[in-house]
Protein backbone atom coordinates (compact mmCIF):
# COMPACT_ATOMS: atom_id res chain seq x y z
CA UNK A 1 0.00 0.00 0.00
CA UNK A 2 2.75 2.46 0.99
CA UNK A 3 4.66 2.05 -2.26
CA UNK A 4 1.54 3.19 -4.15
CA UNK A 5 1.89 6.75 -2.82
CA UNK A 6 2.88 9.01 -5.72
CA UNK A 7 2.98 12.32 -3.82
CA UNK A 8 6.61 13.47 -3.63
CA UNK A 9 7.86 11.21 -6.43
CA UNK A 10 9.32 12.46 -9.72
CA UNK A 11 8.56 10.77 -13.05
CA UNK A 12 11.26 11.55 -15.59
CA UNK A 13 10.09 12.06 -19.16
CA UNK A 14 9.97 14.83 -21.75
CA UNK A 15 6.65 16.67 -21.90
CA UNK A 16 5.22 20.16 -22.14
CA UNK A 17 4.30 20.07 -18.45
CA UNK A 18 7.84 19.04 -17.47
CA UNK A 19 9.26 21.96 -19.46
CA UNK A 20 6.99 24.55 -17.83
CA UNK A 21 8.52 26.94 -15.31
CA UNK A 22 8.15 25.31 -11.86
CA UNK A 23 6.63 28.53 -10.49
CA UNK A 24 3.78 28.14 -12.97
CA UNK A 25 3.20 24.58 -11.76
CA UNK A 26 3.14 25.59 -8.09
CA UNK A 27 0.76 28.49 -8.73
CA UNK A 28 -1.32 26.25 -10.99
CA UNK A 29 -1.58 23.58 -8.29
CA UNK A 30 -2.68 26.17 -5.71
CA UNK A 31 -5.27 27.58 -8.13
CA UNK A 32 -6.52 24.06 -8.87
CA UNK A 33 -6.86 23.21 -5.16
CA UNK A 34 -8.72 26.47 -4.49
CA UNK A 35 -11.01 25.79 -7.47
CA UNK A 36 -12.01 22.44 -5.94
CA UNK A 37 -13.39 24.34 -2.94
CA UNK A 38 -14.91 27.11 -5.06
CA UNK A 39 -17.14 24.83 -7.14
CA UNK A 40 -19.99 23.06 -5.37
CA UNK A 41 -21.87 21.29 -8.17
CA UNK A 42 -21.22 18.15 -10.19
CA UNK A 43 -20.94 20.34 -13.29
CA UNK A 44 -18.16 22.29 -11.56
CA UNK A 45 -16.31 19.10 -10.60
CA UNK A 46 -16.66 17.91 -14.19
CA UNK A 47 -14.85 21.07 -15.35
CA UNK A 48 -12.11 20.39 -12.76
CA UNK A 49 -11.87 16.80 -14.01
CA UNK A 50 -11.54 17.94 -17.63
CA UNK A 51 -8.79 20.39 -16.66
CA UNK A 52 -6.92 17.69 -14.71
CA UNK A 53 -7.30 15.19 -17.58
CA UNK A 54 -5.83 17.74 -20.00
CA UNK A 55 -2.85 18.31 -17.68
CA UNK A 56 -2.27 14.55 -17.35
CA UNK A 57 -2.25 14.23 -21.16
CA UNK A 58 0.29 17.07 -21.39
CA UNK A 59 2.50 15.45 -18.73
CA UNK A 60 3.07 12.14 -20.60
CA UNK A 61 2.87 10.37 -17.22
CA UNK A 62 0.94 7.07 -17.47
CA UNK A 63 -2.58 7.39 -16.06
CA UNK A 64 -2.21 4.11 -14.17
CA UNK A 65 0.92 5.39 -12.43
CA UNK A 66 -0.91 8.52 -11.26
CA UNK A 67 -4.17 6.83 -10.23
CA UNK A 68 -2.43 4.10 -8.22
CA UNK A 69 -1.75 6.74 -5.55
CA UNK A 70 -5.47 6.59 -4.75
CA UNK A 71 -5.04 3.15 -3.17
CA UNK A 72 -3.17 4.73 -0.25
CA UNK A 73 -6.11 7.00 0.66
CA UNK A 74 -8.87 4.49 -0.05
CA UNK A 75 -9.61 3.93 3.66
CA UNK A 76 -9.69 7.69 4.32
CA UNK A 77 -11.99 8.09 1.32
CA UNK A 78 -14.40 5.43 2.59
CA UNK A 79 -14.45 6.90 6.12
CA UNK A 80 -15.13 10.40 4.76
CA UNK A 81 -17.94 9.12 2.55
CA UNK A 82 -19.49 7.10 5.40
CA UNK A 83 -19.56 10.02 7.83
CA UNK A 84 -21.16 12.33 5.28
CA UNK A 85 -23.54 9.63 4.06
CA UNK A 86 -25.01 8.73 7.46
CA UNK A 87 -24.65 11.95 9.48
CA UNK A 88 -26.00 14.55 7.03
CA UNK A 89 -29.63 15.48 7.86
CA UNK A 90 -32.23 15.76 5.12
CA UNK A 91 -34.76 13.75 3.11
CA UNK A 92 -34.46 10.10 4.19
CA UNK A 93 -34.01 7.62 1.32
CA UNK A 94 -33.02 4.43 3.18
CA UNK A 95 -33.19 3.56 6.88
CA UNK A 96 -31.03 0.75 8.32
CA UNK A 97 -31.76 0.46 12.04
CA UNK A 98 -30.68 3.71 13.67
CA UNK A 99 -28.70 4.66 10.56
CA UNK A 100 -30.32 6.60 7.75
CA UNK A 101 -29.16 7.59 4.29
CA UNK A 102 -30.47 10.97 3.17
CA UNK A 103 -30.61 12.49 -0.29
CA UNK A 104 -28.45 15.40 0.87
CA UNK A 105 -25.98 13.00 2.53
CA UNK A 106 -25.66 10.92 -0.64
CA UNK A 107 -24.99 13.98 -2.80
CA UNK A 108 -22.57 15.52 -0.27
CA UNK A 109 -20.60 12.28 0.22
CA UNK A 110 -20.18 11.88 -3.55
CA UNK A 111 -18.99 15.47 -3.84
CA UNK A 112 -16.49 15.02 -1.00
CA UNK A 113 -15.14 11.81 -2.56
CA UNK A 114 -14.72 13.50 -5.95
CA UNK A 115 -13.07 16.55 -4.35
CA UNK A 116 -10.61 14.49 -2.31
CA UNK A 117 -9.71 12.26 -5.27
CA UNK A 118 -9.11 15.20 -7.62
CA UNK A 119 -7.09 17.00 -4.93
CA UNK A 120 -4.72 14.07 -4.35
CA UNK A 121 -4.20 13.38 -8.06
CA UNK A 122 -3.73 17.07 -8.88
CA UNK A 123 -1.19 17.56 -6.07
CA UNK A 124 0.74 14.45 -7.11
CA UNK A 125 0.97 15.69 -10.69
CA UNK A 126 3.06 18.69 -9.59
CA UNK A 127 5.76 16.60 -7.90
CA UNK A 128 5.69 14.00 -10.69
CA UNK A 129 6.67 16.69 -13.22
CA UNK A 130 9.02 18.83 -11.08
CA UNK A 131 12.51 17.91 -9.84
CA UNK A 132 13.55 18.66 -6.22
CA UNK A 133 15.95 21.41 -7.34
CA UNK A 134 13.28 23.06 -9.49
CA UNK A 135 10.80 22.86 -6.63
CA UNK A 136 13.23 24.50 -4.19
CA UNK A 137 14.13 27.29 -6.63
CA UNK A 138 10.47 27.93 -7.45
CA UNK A 139 9.35 28.13 -3.81
CA UNK A 140 12.28 30.44 -3.01
CA UNK A 141 11.43 32.68 -5.97
CA UNK A 142 7.74 32.89 -5.02
CA UNK A 143 8.58 33.69 -1.39
CA UNK A 144 11.33 36.15 -2.36
CA UNK A 145 9.36 39.30 -1.29
CA UNK A 146 9.46 38.02 2.31
CA UNK A 147 13.23 38.60 2.39
CA UNK A 148 12.48 42.25 3.11
CA UNK A 149 11.11 41.14 6.47
CA UNK A 150 14.27 39.06 7.21
CA UNK A 151 12.44 35.79 6.59
CA UNK A 152 14.91 32.95 5.73
CA UNK A 153 13.23 32.20 2.41
CA UNK A 154 15.90 29.85 1.02
CA UNK A 155 15.96 27.72 4.17
CA UNK A 156 12.15 27.49 4.25
CA UNK A 157 12.07 26.47 0.58
CA UNK A 158 14.77 23.86 1.19
CA UNK A 159 12.92 22.39 4.19
CA UNK A 160 9.63 22.19 2.29
CA UNK A 161 11.31 20.50 -0.67
CA UNK A 162 13.17 17.98 1.50
CA UNK A 163 10.02 17.18 3.52
CA UNK A 164 8.02 16.60 0.33
CA UNK A 165 10.69 14.34 -1.16
CA UNK A 166 11.02 12.36 2.08
CA UNK A 167 7.40 11.15 1.83
CA UNK A 168 8.02 8.37 -0.75
CA UNK A 169 11.34 7.48 0.91
CA UNK A 170 9.69 6.95 4.30
CA UNK A 171 6.82 5.03 2.71
CA UNK A 172 9.31 2.73 0.99
CA UNK A 173 11.17 2.28 4.28
CA UNK A 174 7.89 1.42 6.04
CA UNK A 175 7.13 -1.19 3.38
CA UNK A 176 10.57 -2.79 3.88
CA UNK A 177 10.16 -2.89 7.67
CA UNK A 178 6.69 -4.45 7.33
CA UNK A 179 8.04 -7.18 5.03
CA UNK A 180 10.90 -7.87 7.45
CA UNK A 181 8.48 -8.20 10.38
CA UNK A 182 6.10 -10.39 8.35
CA UNK A 183 9.07 -12.72 7.72
CA UNK A 184 9.46 -12.91 11.52
CA UNK A 185 5.79 -13.84 12.03
CA UNK A 186 4.07 -10.46 12.40
CA UNK A 187 0.43 -10.35 11.27
CA UNK A 188 -0.60 -7.18 9.41
CA UNK A 189 -3.52 -8.82 7.56
CA UNK A 190 -5.78 -9.37 10.58
CA UNK A 191 -9.42 -8.42 9.99
CA UNK A 192 -9.70 -7.29 13.62
CA UNK A 193 -9.14 -3.51 13.53
CA UNK A 194 -7.74 -3.32 17.09
CA UNK A 195 -5.24 -6.14 16.44
CA UNK A 196 -4.26 -4.52 13.18
CA UNK A 197 -3.59 -1.18 14.91
CA UNK A 198 -1.55 -2.92 17.63
CA UNK A 199 0.55 -4.71 15.01
CA UNK A 200 1.48 -1.34 13.49
CA UNK A 201 2.93 -0.01 16.79
CA UNK A 202 6.23 -1.98 16.49
CA UNK A 203 6.80 -0.20 13.16
CA UNK A 204 7.21 3.18 14.83
CA UNK A 205 10.56 2.66 16.58
CA UNK A 206 12.54 1.33 13.57
CA UNK A 207 10.82 3.89 11.33
CA UNK A 208 11.83 6.80 13.58
CA UNK A 209 15.39 5.47 13.83
CA UNK A 210 15.56 5.14 10.04
CA UNK A 211 14.18 8.66 9.55
CA UNK A 212 16.71 10.21 11.93
CA UNK A 213 19.54 8.22 10.33
CA UNK A 214 18.57 9.43 6.86
CA UNK A 215 18.25 13.00 8.13
CA UNK A 216 21.72 12.78 9.70
CA UNK A 217 23.21 11.36 6.48
CA UNK A 218 21.63 14.18 4.48
CA UNK A 219 22.94 16.82 6.91
CA UNK A 220 26.48 15.39 6.74
CA UNK A 221 26.32 15.30 2.92
CA UNK A 222 25.20 18.94 2.83
CA UNK A 223 27.99 19.98 5.22
CA UNK A 224 30.55 18.04 3.16
CA UNK A 225 29.50 20.15 0.17
CA UNK A 226 29.96 23.35 2.22
CA UNK A 227 26.26 24.19 2.31
CA UNK A 228 25.76 27.37 4.34
CA UNK A 229 22.24 28.45 3.43
CA UNK A 230 21.15 30.86 0.73
CA UNK A 231 23.63 33.69 1.42
CA UNK A 232 25.77 34.35 -1.64
CA UNK A 233 24.37 31.41 -3.60
CA UNK A 234 23.79 31.75 -7.34
CA UNK A 235 21.62 29.67 -9.67
CA UNK A 236 23.09 27.33 -12.25
CA UNK A 237 19.78 27.48 -14.14
CA UNK A 238 18.01 30.76 -13.32
CA UNK A 239 14.24 30.70 -13.67
CA UNK A 240 13.07 32.78 -16.64
CA UNK A 241 9.49 32.99 -17.86
CA UNK A 242 8.96 32.03 -21.50
CA UNK A 243 6.02 32.34 -23.88
CA UNK A 244 4.54 28.98 -22.89
CA UNK A 245 4.59 30.01 -19.21
CA UNK A 246 2.65 33.21 -19.93
CA UNK A 247 0.15 31.19 -21.98
CA UNK A 248 -0.20 28.78 -19.04
CA UNK A 249 -1.00 31.67 -16.68
CA UNK A 250 -3.68 32.92 -19.10
CA UNK A 251 -5.17 29.41 -19.22
CA UNK A 252 -5.23 29.30 -15.40
CA UNK A 253 -7.06 32.64 -15.24
CA UNK A 254 -9.66 31.42 -17.76
CA UNK A 255 -10.10 28.11 -15.90
CA UNK A 256 -10.54 29.80 -12.52
CA UNK A 257 -12.99 32.32 -14.01
CA UNK A 258 -15.14 29.44 -15.28
CA UNK A 259 -15.09 27.82 -11.82
CA UNK A 260 -16.16 31.09 -10.16
CA UNK A 261 -18.97 31.53 -12.71
CA UNK A 262 -20.22 28.00 -12.03
CA UNK A 263 -20.24 28.78 -8.31
CA UNK A 264 -22.25 32.00 -8.51
CA UNK A 265 -24.28 31.28 -11.66
CA UNK A 266 -27.13 29.33 -10.05
CA UNK A 267 -28.76 27.37 -12.88
CA UNK A 268 -31.71 25.07 -11.98
CA UNK A 269 -30.19 22.00 -13.67
CA UNK A 270 -26.89 22.24 -11.76
CA UNK A 271 -26.76 20.06 -8.63
PLM features: residue spans?
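Transmembrane alpha-helix interface motif
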Residues: 1-42, 48-57, 144, 148-151, ...
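Membrane-helix interfacial "entry" motifs
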Residues: 14, 37, 60-65, 96, ...
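Alpha-helical transmembrane segments and their helix-start/interface "positive-inside/aromatic belt" motifs
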Residues: 25, 64-74, 248
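Transmembrane helix-loop junctions in multipass membrane proteins, especially transporters and channels
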Residues: 41, 45, 60-64, 88-96, ...
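Alpha-helical transmembrane segments and their membrane-interface exit regions
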Residues: 51-61, 76-79
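Loop-to-transmembrane-helix entry motif
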Residues: 69-73, 77, 113, 117, ...
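Juxtamembrane/interface alpha-helical elements of multi-pass membrane proteins
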Residues: 73-186
Amino acid sequence: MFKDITLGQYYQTDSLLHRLDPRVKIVGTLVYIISLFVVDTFAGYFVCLLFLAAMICLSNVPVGYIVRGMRAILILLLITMSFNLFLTPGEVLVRIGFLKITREGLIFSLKMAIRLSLLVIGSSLMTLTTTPNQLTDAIESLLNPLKRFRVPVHEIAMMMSIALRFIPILMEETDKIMKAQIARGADFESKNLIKKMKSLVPLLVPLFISAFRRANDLAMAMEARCYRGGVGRTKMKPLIYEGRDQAAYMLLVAYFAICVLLRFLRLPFLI
